[in-house]
């Protein structure tokens, strides 16, 4: 378990991280989300040990994170590859800088390339790789020394839907043996691999955003088996009714609606209801609501 307690950091007299506290559980993938300049990358660099905070503590298994540097893997938002190197050469170069010996690298390089789906590109020059392949190579570099804590900064931000899907599937596989934190603004994609999300803005944690399907009790969508006949809107005072199509209507109000009472009223008016349900609230909508007033 990784425990972050009352973390605070100022740079050039500007408060960047303000009393940050949270926990990352073992084999959890935690998503860190927030608008630009919220402090996400700075927080991740503190977790990696690259930046030391002014105050607070970061512990891993009850010991300072600085005593676990060999257990941490880090992928920055912009990975600096040498484009003329092959995938194998790049990993070998990075591995030697990290203190891994030749025998270990001979064993680990084929293994990590296979794990990230680049075993057929082992001798491929990096400049010929797609964006998604480069990101997977970056993750291969981050896990080369077999860390137990993996930090990923926007790993899928510049990728197409297929590339983002591949990265999220890879993260799902990795979290079976690692604890992971990933910063992202691609919420609907990241919910595939993240167990929960924390929202940060202006260096402060606004709170958790769970990865559950929430509903808006102020909006109800009704689908019918046949086109809806004329009905009396006066039965629904202070309710806005939108006709999506002849067999689909949305009811909206400023206050929570009673779903069962609405169903009874519609049936009494001759509606043949196929389904009636509160409208789901997406992660992005909940995130925008959370940061709007801060």
What are these regions (language model features)?
Residues 219-290:
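Short, charged/small-residue-rich alpha-helical element at the C-terminal edge
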Residues 53-68:
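Conserved ABC transporter NBD signature motif
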Residues 48:
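Helix-to-loop junction immediately C-terminal to a conserved catalytic motif
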Residues 167-250:
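ABC transporter nucleotide-binding domain
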Residues 150-154:
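Catalytic Walker B motif of ABC-type/P-loop ATPase nucleotide-binding domains
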Residues 92, 96, 103-121:
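Conserved ABC ATPase "signature" region
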